[in-house]
Amino acid sequence: MLQLNYIRENKEEVLKRLAIKSFKDAETIIDKVIELDNSRRATQKDGDAIKAEANAIAKQIGELMKAGKKEAAEIQKAKTAELKLREKNLDEALKGIEEDIKNLLLQVPNTPSAKVPLGKTPEDNELVFEHGTKPTLAQGSVPHWDLTTKYNLIDFELGVKLTGAGFPVYKGKGARLQRALINYFLDKATEAGYMEVQPPIMVNEDSAYATGQLPDKEGQMYHMTVDDLYLIPTAEVPITNIYRDVILKESDLPIKNCGYTPCFRREAGSYGKDVRGLNRLHQFDKIEIVQITHPDKSYEALEQMKDYVAGILKELELPFRVLKLCGGDMSFASALTYDLEVWSAAQQRWLEVSSVSNFETFQTNRLKCRFKGADGKTQLAHSLNGSALALPRIVASLLENNQTPEGIKIPKVLVPYTGFEIIN
């Protein structure tokens, strides 16, 4: 959530940055926010004046009582009662105005960084670099959904029977490959200085609002209405919320956490070839990395996180590319995002496997996650997160790119985790 003072002091800049994200109602909402804030300030000023007057009268009453002037004191007490009623009404009005401001601010996306490329569609994203050689597959090579059936790795139909489409059942070496990737990704993260946490996979409404999933992605989340809980779309939500309503020491920064969780997304409106097999699921496994940093260090941390994920893809020997997302392709909460995509040899297209983002103070303002500097003053920290990595499309590309007439070869770095070198 954008900070109210920042909006007041930088209205034109805020509108300019929001236009990069193609936020249509920006001017209407921002003008209304400023109008309400003016009302808030006026109401607050009136309330403070009444409190000051009531305090002065209370002092007078004490002096009158000491002087034995009870009748005059009673007159002043009547004034005090009237002032308290006015104060109560102003407090209620103030709460209503503040709630209206909050509800409007919740609709406003984060302002993109000045480093964000201009554009409205994925075609406008900026290519940062591409790594690796796209493999040339032997004749008769097939996409991963055929490979998983051929080698009895994943049963999509059984998942439909048990739950529905988008909930695959991993079996045999398919399940072992899944577990191997999870352990490998977690080991890499802890080696890089991230503390592993195992958070809940359901969160309350406050947590979903704090990281920006609500109200932006309400239709994409599974909502457990009986208990009013949400299945998490990413471990970012519970891990980042560890620091909700927390004041850190500057020496605590940066905080680096990682965690593995199943993730759940409704993916409403997704159809066609792009959702076949592992390309888009309702339940999938992912390792997330999260950092809470000093504002001066967050973009340095973003580059480190992007390079860290790229390093894993290099070890997996997967051709990949890094994109800097344009304003129109960015998420609601992000200030700057890198997407990392791997090459799918059988599908002949790029598959997104990671998004690494800096949210600056957008999440921490909602979280009320602050730190106290050496001067004793508190300020909002910056938050960042990234997928490191999401498993489904990694598995898809590993199976497709490494298929041979003899079977599917396992990357060397994974063999100690899988216990086998080939799937045949």
Where are the regions that the model predicts?
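N-terminal alpha-helical targeting/anchoring segments
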Residues: 1-135, 149, 153, 157
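TRNA-recognition modules of translation machinery and tRNA-sensing kinases, especially anticodon-binding
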Residues: 130-424
